[in-house]
Swiss-Prot record:
Aquaporins contain two tandem repeats each containing three membrane-spanning domains and a pore-forming loop with the signature motif Asn-Pro-Ala (NPA). Glycans are attached at residues 153, 206. One of its GO terms (biological process) is water transport. It comes from Bos taurus (Bovine). A motif (NPA 1) lies at residues 97-99. This is Aquaporin-4. The modification Phosphothreonine is found at residue 289. GO terms for molecular function: water channel activity. CDD domains: MIP. Residues 1-36, 90-93, 102-115, 177-184, 253-323 are cytoplasmic. It is a multi-pass membrane protein. InterPro entries: Aquaporin-like (IPR023271), Aquaporin_transptr (IPR034294), MIP (IPR000425), MIP_CS (IPR022357). The modification Phosphoserine is found at residues 111, 180, 276, 285, 321.
Length: 323
């Protein structure tokens, strides 16, 4: 009998609560600025995949293949991503990588709803970029179109570990380079990210093809229909990215103010459990932190609790995330 009133209350509150939760989750999505950012992620990934995969084409063909030029490939990938971050960083944040986007979600710099659109745009851009390269490349030299594969002498577990490590160093570089609390960063953030990508390729091309980017592997895999060990290029980079983002954000360089608020919240919760149980309603609007947007000489800082922005506020009230 006692469950019926509760069921009635839930019947009235449930749909409303669900609608409110959905509206909060999709806050800022239906804005022109956000869709410009999604389009930028799509275009940046398309150009990146087209240019970088082009460096993997062996123009000697299958009969007389030329030696693989690891330096050429590494520089092309690194400089391509640096250029795209420089071009689109102020529009979308320049993720250009689903693993980076997931790391931003885990560190509360972008909402889950927005990340879904970002990742979809990245994957679509990668497919179209790989498709364009396939169309303009002679069939006799197209080869594997840069599809990432694990070396024959390596197990899937070893390949997974390699992808985890190289993505970890990339994402850690991103978080360290874009840390607004640092005053010693004077060089180009885009170039630092590009160098990190190049280093990952120099190390891991012979191991796994050095993906570090699930969309980069997804695009050519769709065009060529080659899905061998493809899961490695999603699981490895995403785990490495989440570990890097979490360790940097919450262990190595935590925000002092955020840490203080967490302590206050936990202490209040502990005090409430000691007395009578109370249901507390928080009327403050929940605003997620959409991280820093790269601009030359300008750093954007957002207050995590209050959603206050010191510079460059988006018309929707939020700031798009960035690397």
């Amino acid at each position: 009998m006692s469950d019926r009133p509760a069921a009635r209350r839930w019947g009235k509150c449930g749909p409303l609560c669900t609608r409110e939760s959905i509206m909060v989750a999709f806050k800022g999505v239906w804005t022109q600025t956000f869709w410009k950012a999604v389009t930028a992620e799509f275009l940046a990934m398309l150009i990146f995949v087209l240019l970088s995969l082009g460096s993997t084409i062996n123009w000697g063909g299958a009969e007389k293949p030329l030696p693989v030029d690891m330096v050429l490939i590494s520089l092309c990938f690194g400089l391509s991503i640096a250029t795209m971050v420089q071009c689109f960083g102020h529009i979308s944040g320049g993720h250009i990588n689903p693993a980076v986007t997931v790391a931003m979600v885990c560190t509360r710099r972008i909402s889950i709803a927005k990340s879904v659109f970002y990742i979809a745009a990245q994957c679509l851009g990668a497919i179209i970029g790989a498709g364009i390269l396939y169309l303009v490349t002679p069939p006799s030299v197209v080869g594997g179109l840069g599809v990432t594969t694990v070396h024959g002498n390596l197990s899937a577990g070893h390949g997974l570990l390699v992808e985890l490590i190289i993505t970890f160093q990339l994402v850690f570089t991103i978080f360290a380079s874009c840390d607004s609390k640092r005053t010693d960063v004077t060089g180009s953030i885009a170039l630092a990210i590009g160098i990190s990508v190049a280093i990952g390729h120099l190390f891991a091309i012979n191991y796994t093809g050095a993906s570090m980017n699930p969309a980069r592997s997804f695009g050519p895999a769709v065009i060529m229909g080659n899905w061998e060990n493809h899961w490695i290029y999603w699981v490895g980079p995403i785990i490495g990215a989440v570990l890097a983002g979490g360790l940097y954000e919450y262990v190595f360089c935590p925000d002092v103010e955020l840490k203080r608020r967490f302590k206050e919240a936990f202490s209040k919760a502990a005090q409430q459990t000691k007395g009578s149980y109370m249901e507390v309603e928080d009327n403050r609007s929940q605003v997620e932190t959409d991280d820093l947007i790269l601009k030359p000489g300008v750093v954007h800082v957002i207050d995590i609790d209050r959603g206050e922005e010191k510079k460059g506020k988006d018309p929707s009230g939020e700031v798009l995330s960035s690397v």
